[in-house]
Amino acid sequence: MINIRKTHPLMKIVNNAFIDLPAPSNISSWWNFGSLLGICLILQILTGLFLAMHYTSDTMTAFSSVTHICRDVNYGWIIRYMHANGASMFFICLFMHVGRGLYYGSYTFLETWNIGVILLFTVMATAFVGYVLPWGQMSFWGATVITNLLSAIPYIGTNLVEWIWGGFSVDKATLTRFFAFHFILPFIIAALAMVHLLFLHETGSNNPTGIPSDADKIPFYPYYTIKDILGILLLILFLMLLVLFAPDLLGDPDNYTPANPLNTPPHIKPEWYFLFAYAILRSIPNKLGGVLALVSSILILILMPLLHTSKQRSMMFRPFSQCLFWVLVADLLTLTWIGGQPVEYPFIIIGQLASILYFFIILVLMPITSTIENNLLKW
């Protein structure tokens, strides 16, 4: 009997990607985050679609329309909070996914890694324009401050900012175009994710040891299907705990005040998942320097394959590099904390030291440590 799963042109693609895919037999739960990101994206697109049915992208009615969704639309409150907190879960999974890639040397798959970095930028852009839509105080001032950073670009900066704004300040035109961007970008993310997966399946997955696993492969279904389902159930559990018990835990109280261009909030800050980059931006007193540091803090990921000096791929058998990796994680958590603090002593100096340490670990200490480990093993 001909198996339709293996012969049908469309089903064959799905089969080779999710069913008969040969996978390493020893990949740990750190490899779950790819599928979790896929679930997050689907969840965000679905909840976002239902929100877009009731939302109006006009400065006069945007805030009221979000209130209307929460008060009057059937289960509108749960859809709204699933979307807002779903973004937080998305970024938690993203950071774990990137961290796994750094720890286990997955960045040696160049195409997959570079598409992944582009995906990270796209998701960050989507989250930023989405945060502007409720048109609260932090939405408005966040949009004003972050878009204003582009004015640091020499010669064309000011024109560029006014072009993005569609006027001389953040106003109706800005809100409308941000809604359009926020609607289209998730579909671009979905397309990029397919390309990401395409490149990954050209090489096959990495594994915790970093050693080629061609000699020991198992089919994706049922082993990793079950493992992924467990991860998905845990993700939904954490998301629903957040949505049903503490929906505003990760939000900003200022965003419950309608946008007012005449009243600046005492402390402008983005959502928690951007705070580490925001802290790096603020730690440099010069505007252009801050913007360059901000972009570099993410763009530095593209350099990871070039900075890999170890003879081993993974950090699994490299204790010194492991210590350095966890210091980097602690440094990023420190930056996240600093990003949410006011600009005053001692937070300024802590932020500057943490920012210097971030770049120093990645650009200097990691390559040196890897070389030392090579020499200790007489390689």
UniProtKB/Swiss-Prot annotation:
Residues that coordinate or bind heme b b562: 83, 182
Cofactor: heme b
Membrane-spanning segments: 33-53, 77-98, 113-133, 178-198, 226-246, 288-308, 320-340, 347-367
A Gene Ontology cellular-component term: mitochondrial inner membrane
Amino-acid positions noted as binding heme b b566 in the UniProt annotation, renumbered to this chain: 97, 196
Note describing how the cofactor binds: Binds 2 heme b groups non-covalently.
Keyword annotations of the record: Electron transport, Heme, Iron, Membrane, Metal-binding, Mitochondrion, Mitochondrion inner membrane, Respiratory chain, Transmembrane, Transmembrane helix, Transport, Ubiquinone
Signal sequence, start to end: none
InterPro entries xrefs: Cyt_b/b6_C, Cyt_b/b6_C_sf, Cyt_b/b6_N, Cytb/b6-like_sf, Cytochrome_b, Cytochrome_b_C_euk/bac, Cytochrome_b_N_euk/bac, Di-haem_cyt_TM
Entry-linked CDD domains: cytochrome_b_C, Cytochrome_b_N
GO molecular function, one term: metal ion binding
Residue positions binding a ubiquinone: 201
Gene3D superfamilies on file: Cytochrome Bc1 Complex, Chain C
A matching Pfam family: Cytochrom_B_C
GO biological process: mitochondrial electron transport, ubiquinol to cytochrome c
Domain of life: Eukaryota
Topology of this chain in the membrane: Multi-pass membrane protein
Localization in the cell: Mitochondrion inner membrane
Miscellaneous notes: Heme 1 (or BL or b562) is low-potential and absorbs at about 562 nm, and heme 2 (or BH or b566) is high-potential and absorbs at about 566 nm.
Family: Belongs to the cytochrome b family.
The protein's assembly and partners: The cytochrome bc1 complex contains 11 subunits: 3 respiratory subunits (MT-CYB, CYC1 and UQCRFS1), 2 core proteins (UQCRC1 and UQCRC2) and 6 low-molecular weight proteins (UQCRH/QCR6, UQCRB/QCR7, UQCRQ/QCR8, UQCR10/QCR9, UQCR11/QCR10 and a cleavage product of UQCRFS1). This cytochrome bc1 complex then forms a dimer.
Annotated function: Component of the ubiquinol-cytochrome c reductase complex (complex III or cytochrome b-c1 complex) that is part of the mitochondrial respiratory chain. The b-c1 complex mediates electron transfer from ubiquinol to cytochrome c. Contributes to the generation of a proton gradient across the mitochondrial membrane that is then used for ATP synthesis.
Name the UniProt record assigns to this protein: Cytochrome b
Record gene name: MT-CYB
